[in-house]
Each structure stands twice: as C-alpha cells, then as structure tokens.
C-alpha cells in the first residue's frame, strides 16, 4: 500500500464540487483508494463523492490517500501531482462578509419615513416587485407509498431520467449554472447515493418513496453535523436532487412547488433549491428573501451570477401578512420597504437611474483600451483555460487573451484530443474574440502535469523535469497535431503561438521547423489555414535572460511566466511549506532580471508581457508599468480594477519608482518604497459638464441631494456617495441652505470627496426646501475636500454675491443647456 499525505488546501472544505473532481481522479485507477481525514478519524471510499463529503473535511485538515492495487505506483504519482497542483482549483472563493456589508440607511431615504423590515445582505442590488410567498413542499405523501415489486425498476428508470434531464440542462447552460448542475449529476451517479436507497428497500423493506427520503435525511444529517458552514449548506443540494427524483417517479402525485412569474416578483421562501431557481423566469424575478439560505449555498451563487438581490434574516411569519403587496428589496442597505409611498418609490427611481448610469459607464470604461494617466499604452489581457471563459473575459474588458492554456484539453481523459476537437476549441475562442489577439500556449504537459496516456516515468523533481517543449521531440506527432489545429483555427482570427519552458535557441529552431512542416502538410491536405503565425516564447527559465538578443532574431514576442520563473530563479518549490516563504517575485534580483529582459527586447523592437499571478497584483502595478512591460495578462475578474488603477498612474513617476526599486538591497526596502509611493491625483476642475443638469424632475429635497451625491459617485469624484450624502445632510440640519430667489446651496467639507466639485440641478418644477426662503428650482451643491482650508468659504461667498445679482440669476434660469450654464459660471466665477 502507498500513501499520499497532505493538508486540505480547499478554503471551503471538501464539498460537492471538489469531491466530484477527486472522485473522478481516483476512479480511473484499478487500485482501491481510501481517503482519511485524521482530524475526524473518518474514512471514505475515494471513488464516492458522497462518501468524501461525509468525512466533514475542512481547510487545513490533515488527510491522506491510501492506495492499494496493481497500478498503485502510477496512481500515486498522478494523484500526488493532482493534490499538490490542481486540487485547489476545484474550489472557489466566495465573497467575504465585508464585501456583503449593508450600507447605512441614507438620510434621503430615512427622512421619507418608509415602512422597513431589516435583513442581512446575501447578494447586493435593488429589486421592485410584488411579494410572493412560496410554501415548502411536504414529502409525507411520498413517504407512505407502499413498497412494490416494481420499485427497483422504477428507481433505475428515475435515476436515468434525472441524469438525462441534467445532461440536457448542462448542454444549455454555462458558468455557475453548469458547474452546479455538474455537481448534482455527480451526486446521483454516485454509487453510494443509489446504493443506500437499494439497501433501505432490501434490508429495511422500505418503499421506494420512503427509501429516497430516508437516504436524503441520512446524508443531510451528516452534512448538518459538519463544523463547516459551507458543508452544512450542501443540504439544499441533497434535498434538491432527492425531491427531483420523487417528482420524476410520481409526477401525478404532487407537482413540485414550481412558480410561474408573470410580473416582477420578490420571492419569499424558507429556502429555494438550485433546480427551483433555474426553473424561474429571471426576467420577472426582482429579488428573493430566503429565511434559511446561507452565504455559500448554490442557490445564492446562482443568484449572484444572475444579479438577483437576496436578503436573509427576515422570518417568514413577519412577511407573510404582506403577501401580494408591492415592495422594494434593497440589498444595498439591507432593508425591505413594504408598500412604498410615492416619495419612497421616487427615491428608488433615482437610485435606479444612478445604477443605470454607473453600469453604462463601467461597460464603456471596460471597453476602452488601457492607458496610464499620461497616455502610456499597455495591453490588458486575460488568462483562460477554455473557450467558455472567453466571453466573460472580454466583458470584463480583456483586450485579448495573453495565455490560453491548451493543456487543459489534454487532461482528465484516456487519450489525447484529436486535431478536429482541438481545431473546434481554438476556433471557438477566436470567433468570440473578433480581431482581439489570442495567444495559444502549446501544451505544457509532462513533469508536474502528468498525463497517464503518455506513460512518462515518475520524476523526483517534476517542476524541473520532462515537460512542455522538452517532450515535444519524443511526441512529435502529438505536437504536430496541435500545430495543425492552431494553424487551421488561426485563419478565423488573430491567433498567436507561444512555446513554454524554452531554455535554448536550439529548441525554438526545432519548433520553427515543425511549424513549417505543419504548414506544408495543411497545404497538401487542402485545408484552410494561416500561412504564417506570430511566434513567441514563455520566459520562465533564467538561462533565456542572457541570450534574449539571439531569441529576438527568431521570435516575435516574449511573455514572462512569473510563477515558474520565481521558483527557478530562487530554487524554491512554492508548494513546499518549508521554503515557500522564500517565494517572492518582488525582490531586487527579480526586478533587475525583468528590467534586463524588457530593455534587451525593446532595443530589438520586440514586445514583452507577463502572464503569471504577478500581472494581476494591483499593489505591484506601478512597478510593472515602470519597468516598461507592454502587456499584463491576468485572471479576468481582476481586469476592471487594474484598468481603473492604471488610469491614475503616471508612467514617468512609475519609471522612477522602478529604478529606485532595482537599487534596493532587500524586498523589505521595495515594499517600503511601494507603501510611500503616492500617485499624483488626476486633477479635475471644480466645474464640469458631467455634474450639471437642466430640466430635472425631483419630487422633493431628498431626491435632489440623493441624485447629486450619487452622480459624483458615478463620475468617480467620490468612492463613498452614501457617506458624502450624510455629510451634506449634517450640514443641512444645522441650518437649511435655501438662500432665496428660488436657489439652494447645500454644501459640505468632507473627507469622502476625492475631487472637489460644484454640482448643479435646474428643476422643471420647484420643490419644498423646508426653508423660510421658499421653494427651490435651482440647486447648486458644493462638495469640497476636508483639506481645502478656507477655500469653501471663498467659493460659497462668490456664489452668494453673484446670486444677489438679478441678471446673473436670470441668465442661469434662462440658459438653454448644461454647456451654457458651465460657460456662464466659468466666465463669472474665479476660484
């Protein structure tokens, strides 16, 4: 017997998704494989995902796999690599509690005296609809169905039908839906799930209905006893597939409580299973209130992915009496507004207007090319492993794909993908990209990414071993097939080719020879293909740094693989806990190496990118910009924030920062430099067209202040519009800011304003400003930084003096548009 010992690396513990993947990895071997959680003293068949889930394994638990059988040597080698390298990728990090904290109730809402119920935010957003109560299903009618001689046949038929339905949904879905459906499919195909139902029928003489329910209750009891919130919340998945199985078996007995949404609806339920959520018409699902759903339930993951706001912590009996009434679910402030009056409805209409503006602006910003504040261009690309990830990456603002990991096509299967399968996968991502560049990294397999069907012997140091370009000559046919597939796909878009683990010029010369052979073959075969293709290499072996000049004669670009390069430069295995603290790319030696690569390549007209984890680290963006990199490729969710940060950076200041960092003596000195580095603020004028509005319709004073503060948030002049609004209201409560002549000047000095601003709204109809000076039809709001000194008094005084002038006031009221108001103020005022 052979053993693999490890600490569980999964942040959420061993739940359905990673359990299914581990089961799949173990099921390909003849050997018996037992999973042991030493903390729990729990053992499980590693070829059963349900058994694995039942071990209650949490993050950092001490675990082992015991392997015994004819292929135990090979199984241990492959499984050890999987546990060390890829097991953690089967889990996903959920939003933290801090990310889901509700905003304090804005004064512009609380002053309207809404009828509110307070809950906990599970998925952010705002939804308006009719409160609709969904009663939980009772399973009692299934439990009392008598046993029948046909029960075994019925069970097999129902399991097959449910599997067929799930497979059909898998073909129609993508993203989180597909992932969760895959987990459900794996559960019903698990031997333990069906086996225990059969056992309950045979040994305890239960009818099929009772056996399905008993099996569900037994599994749920194990999960409910877990110390992990995440594992406890998998109860909903077990209940979901069990209830689906019951309904398929006896559809005539009682239909599941599926709801048809014919109008905008706020759904109220004790809980909702993933399949129930997927059956809803999301166009009419305005929001959900779920009494028992936790922060990591699969239903909640689906809701977040679909931008459906969700609250919890509201007892059903407190809401039931409001069923059928209109409501607003505000999962930004964590409240449910019951039967809102006109003023409250008006508040949320303004909130929706601001949200629409923000969404439109974010979409436009993501679509813009990435530039620094002084217009230094840098490409921002995405790292992906499948064509399905491409649309999401482009939606996040990716200007291309800097790393397409083609090895994903070769993993977790019994044989290599053929040319046609690869061609279709590569073509799919190129068609999705349009004219955006896609860099296909040729298969980085072998070594640390063991592929059973290649039969490469086990190595002591797989990261330094027989992998990537090093195996291509032995598997020349496999490599040529991939080249042919990429060249064929390249005729449909902007494809580029990148070779991993290159360390010598001979390797790239051999690759270029194989590339020419593939082109000749495709011509001979009469297949559509690209005649030429841009060729680059991954710079991850330090030896390449010293002969960049020679490589510039043979390739078109370089992409630095910072993950492996860091390991090789320091001789550090980042998966070894004893030396992993030494793994740090932000050191003088690493930065000098990057500087050397970029300088040598640029001198010869070649571009340099980086595609490791470092490329998406916002803290180090000033250094990467300063070093002169042409491209940063990263996980696509990081792209919007990186683009936004880049626009605030001056490339010359960053270049000086990088120069100083390369002169440092230690990583600690570099970190201190970064901490002290303060990018110059993008100076914005006090008056700007984006903050001036004419012919605005507000019902009250609250809406005016809400809109003007919210608009500053949309325009990036504040990152805290709610807090800024509170400062405005605090000043307003000292003395109302109506100044007469139909004008109000709300104002504040605030730490929450990033760029001091004057905002103006000229109203269609005057509103009550709750001032002795009468109604207001022109609002001029001053929001000045807390460090402005007495400048706010100067600005306020100038405005007040001008407003006394009748001609000036008349000009403001008569101005045809926002530009005319801006021109008038710029002419008349001096700041």
Curated annotation (Swiss-Prot):
Alphabetized PROSITE patterns for the sequence: PEP_ENZYMES_2, PTS_EIIA_TYPE_2, PTS_HPR_DOM
Gene name linked to the record: fryA
Keyword RNA-binding: no
GO molecular function: kinase activity; metal ion binding; phosphoenolpyruvate-protein phosphotransferase activity; protein-N(PI)-phosphohistidine-sugar phosphotransferase activity
Record-level GO BP terms: phosphoenolpyruvate-dependent sugar phosphotransferase system
EC number(s) reported in the record: 2.7.3.9, 2.7.1.202
Cofactor(s) required for function per UniProt: Mg(2+)
Function comment: Multifunctional protein that includes general (non sugar-specific) and sugar-specific components of the phosphoenolpyruvate-dependent sugar phosphotransferase system (sugar PTS). This major carbohydrate active transport system catalyzes the phosphorylation of incoming sugar substrates concomitantly with their translocation across the cell membrane. The enzyme II FryABC PTS system is involved in fructose transport.
Residues that hold Mg(2+) according to the record: 540, 564
Catalytic activity of the protein: L-histidyl-[protein] + phosphoenolpyruvate = N(pros)-phospho-L-histidyl-[protein] + pyruvate; D-fructose(out) + N(pros)-phospho-L-histidyl-[protein] = D-fructose 1-phosphate(in) + L-histidyl-[protein]
Annotated keywords: Cytoplasm, Kinase, Magnesium, Metal-binding, Phosphoprotein, Phosphotransferase system, Sugar transport, Transferase, Transport
Residue ranges of domain PTS EIIA type-2 in the record: 685-828
Gene3D superfamilies hit by this protein: HPr-like, Mannitol-specific EII, Chain A, Phosphoenolpyruvate-binding domains, Phosphohistidine domain, PtsI, HPr-binding domain
Protein name (record): Multiphosphoryl transfer protein
Assigned GO CC terms: cytoplasm; membrane
Residue positions where Phosphohistidine is found in the record: 15, 298, 747
Taxonomic superkingdom: Bacteria
Subcellular location: Cytoplasm
Comment text on domains: The PTS EIIA type-2 domain is phosphorylated by phospho-HPr on a histidyl residue. Then, it transfers the phosphoryl group to the PTS EIIB type-2 domain. In contrast to classical PTS systems, the fructose-like PTS has no requirement for HPr and Enzyme I; FryA combines a IIA domain with an Enzyme I and a HPr domains.
Ranges for region PTS EI: 119-650
Enzyme class: transferase
Family: Belongs to the PEP-utilizing enzyme family.
Entry-linked InterPro entries: HPr-like (IPR000032), HPr-like_sf (IPR035895), PEP-util_enz_mobile_dom (IPR008279), PEP-utilizing_PTS_enzyme (IPR050499), PEP_util_C (IPR000121), PEP_util_CS (IPR023151), Phosphohistidine_dom_sf (IPR036637), PTrfase/Anion_transptr (IPR016152)
Positions of the catalytic residues: 15, 298, 611, 747
